[in-house]
A protein has these predicted regions:
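Alpha-helical interface subdomain recognition
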Residues: 1-226
Length: 226
């Protein structure tokens, strides 16, 4: 009995991370299989070729264990709960973001992955700003604003995946030969560059929804600085 209680508590504690991994993993697999399917062309539909079954079998991954839409709601609402309860130091972090933007501070990071680190940290800051504005506008009713929750979740997913990927690349720097580091490093850089651009798209959808297309100039200045 104690085992199941502990298991339930642990699952609850990491519900946001669990949802992120489920969504990203299933959608990344879908993208890979779809690209492979495209290579086969019309033959991809023929059962004698490998992609037909892979394409069919993978489709269920976005449905079971909670559809990806539901998991986006779960991770979005979980982070809101953590922010409101003070568990993650949301107010303190938001104050740091305000100071960073107001005083035009530099990240202070120096290294090979400076651009990637700054992109990821900017995404986290954008998430905090958008979450704060959403809470200010909708209060306790934020949980019913599915479009806002979905876009907040998309920013969160990028931040989590990019941060985890880059952290692993940097940790492994002294463990493997340079030859074995090249591909993981390029993957981290490409993912951060390609998906980082979309963070502002998600942010604009959230803020335009809140302010009916008239985002305050002060808020725009913050986003432009980041």
């Amino acid at each position: 009995d104690r085992y199941y209680v502990k298991q339930g508590n642990t699952t609850e504690q990491y519900i946001a991370e669990n949802s992120i991994v489920k969504v990203y993993g299933s959608e990344a697999a879908e993208q890979v299989i779809d690209n492979c399917f495209q290579i086969f062309g019309g033959y991809g539909f023929i059962e004698e070729y490998p992609m037909a079954q892979a394409y069919r079998d993978n489709r269920i991954n976005k449905i079971w264990e909670g559809t990806n839409e539901i998991n986006r709601m779960l991770c979005g609402r979980a982070m809101i709960t953590k922010a409101l309860s003070g568990e993650i130091g949301f107010k303190e972090y938001l104050e740091k973001v305000d100071t960073y933007c107001r005083d035009n501070l530099d990240s202070g990071y120096e290294g090979e992955f400076k651009s990637e680190v700054e992109c990821i940290e900017a995404a986290k800051a954008v998430y905090a700003i958008c979450l704060n504005e959403s809470l200010s506008r909708h209060g306790q009713d934020i949980g019913t604003e599915q479009m806002i929750i979905e876009n907040l979740a998309n920013i969160l997913i990028f931040s989590y995946v990019a941060d985890s990927t880059l952290s692993r690349v940097m940790q492994n720097k002294d463990l493997y030969s340079r030859k074995n580091q090249i591909v993981p490093e390029l993957c981290a850089k490409v993912y951060t560059a390609e998906q980082g651009i979309r963070v502002m798209e998600h942010a604009n959808k959230i803020l335009n929804s809140i302010y009916d297309g008239e985002i305050p100039s002060e808020l725009n200045d913050k986003l432009n600085f980041l």
